[in-house]
Amino acid sequence: MTKEEFIKDISTGIPDCLPAPQPYDSTINHAPKRKDILTPEEKKLALRNALRYFPKKFHTILAPEFAKELQNYGRIYMYRFRPSYEMYARPIDEYPHRSEQAAAIMMMIQNNLDKAVAQHPHELITYGGNGAVFQNWAQYRLVMKYLSEMTDEQTLVMYSGHPLGLFPSHRNAPRVVVTNGMVIPNYSKPDDWERDNALGVSQYGQMTAGSYMYIGPQGIVHGTTITVLNAARKRLKEGETSIKGMLFVTSGLGGMSGAQPKAGNIAGVVSITAEINPLAAQKRYDQGWVDELHTSLDELIPAALKAVEEKRTVSMAYVGNAVDLWERLAEKEIHVDLGSDQTSLHNPWAGGYYPVGLSLEESKRMMAEEPQLFKEKVQASLRRQVAAINKLTEKGMYFFDYGNAFLLESSRAGADILKEDGRFRYPSYVQDIMGPMFFDYGFGPFRWVCSSCDSKDLETSDRIATAVLEEIRKTATPDILGQLDDNIHWIKEAGRNHLVVGSQARILYADCEGRTKIALAFNEAIRRGEISRPIVLGRDHHDVSGTDSPFRETSNIYDGSQFCADMAVQNVIGDSFRGATWVSIHNGGGVGWGEVINGGFGMVIDGTEEAERHIRQMLLWDVNNGIARRSWARNTGSMDAIRREMERTPGLCVTLPNLVDDDTINTAF
């Protein structure tokens, strides 16, 4: 397709002439068939909802076609309308646009749907089994058309993938406001998502999938590397300094979980990652994110033990069921240093977890045709997995929940995962590592994308970020030196670690001072022409302020407010009027639908004074909202961090907690 044809296709939106039906591409990793949950009348409603995107003249052709999709896949994806052009992040100037900010958003959307990036690209799923950008291809086409014609005096409103329309606003308003899965709380159970999504009225946006901010598995590699590094450091005996030769066992090679073997390599350990889907395993192998593929445990385990003995850094994938791996390790009493799990247990009944004893295809059939039996199989499998993990932890393994609802769903399955007091046997990685060491001090997954799609601009940005962090380190307080050192090492090695999949993007854990100074330096470099085109700033929702999630991001909040969502909601509101180019707020993400409220932003910076003002105003709020909340929860690191920020920032005045002696409380009752 020529550039002119691409521009015409984008600008057209839904075409006047029906495109030809497209054959089902078996080389692509497709979403499993979803649960058949709609009543006959609801199926008619789903069809009526889908057809409202199209003129009446197409209805007699599309109605039976969409009804068949609903029957075969449990959803109406509108495959016929999938574009014929290749889907990937193009340089910003290749998109038809009246607003440069809108062109940047188009680039970010296409990156989320790139087949090298997305888990189920033809079903518009970026990661996590159900993390959707849109519900169907008509929505994609309409959104791209709106973005191509909007101005900086308009805002596009997005309801769970559906473009409500362009509304008049002003230059400093967001260009796009996104909500995903915003349902009445009493109707926020997993089956409610199944029903609403099948009807075409709501979607699960995960975090960066539905907010157009995914940057491929690099986005989670850094956080996973930090987690593995610090988990491994917990295992060091007195006098030891090297973690080489430690064995890390986990599961999942999907859009997010695929980061684990790469993170293991960067950390310097031996890793084994189980993945039941051979297409997913092969994809990570082809991308160089896992070193070896094994289908036999009899071959894999001796190879891993040899690597441990040699203190060799290597990542191995077991193409098979995770429970088989865990049970064999327990049976053979293999010493495992670190254990975790990153199957998509936020979505356990619809492809997020495949039970032991069933093949991949058997599972796909059963979850669609016998959902109750499939649920029983999943829960039995979790009980077996936990039993094996418990045996290994009794022998000294450090196991942590990686925020995928493993502990939560295992407890619901009746697994031996609870202590006598009702708390989980094992910590969330946020409780033990990410919360007290990073979030409480404002460190989180800051990221940027070069809209030129030029690797030279990314290299320049890496050098700028390194110089900024090294300068900050000179006067940093001792409690954040370790965090700075790990991140300086990360950014210096980023190019050599070949982290880019999709757009020219980088992730870097930084605090408020770091994010702001790096962004201002980027803006100045764009102004001077050292970076050729605008940069998109953003972050994962999994951050200091962006997510209220009692089993993950806010699991180290102990004042009882971990089930409250004021922080995430306030955050997106505050970002929207302080300079964000787009904002989003989602139900679900990470741990699952009904368990989380999370939000994010994107900000296009272009070297202007206006961009500088937005950077200073918005990033300060985006980080310190969460630090202030964590400080009020009496988290020591946050109390120190917010005091330092108030000293630095005129106009910032945060309510601080008064600490009470235990004796005062105990003698009051």
Label the model's feature ranges:
Residues I535, R539-Q570:
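Small-residue-enriched alpha-helical segments and adjacent helix-cap loops
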Residues V270, H335, Y398:
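Residue-level detector of anion-binding/catalytic polar loops
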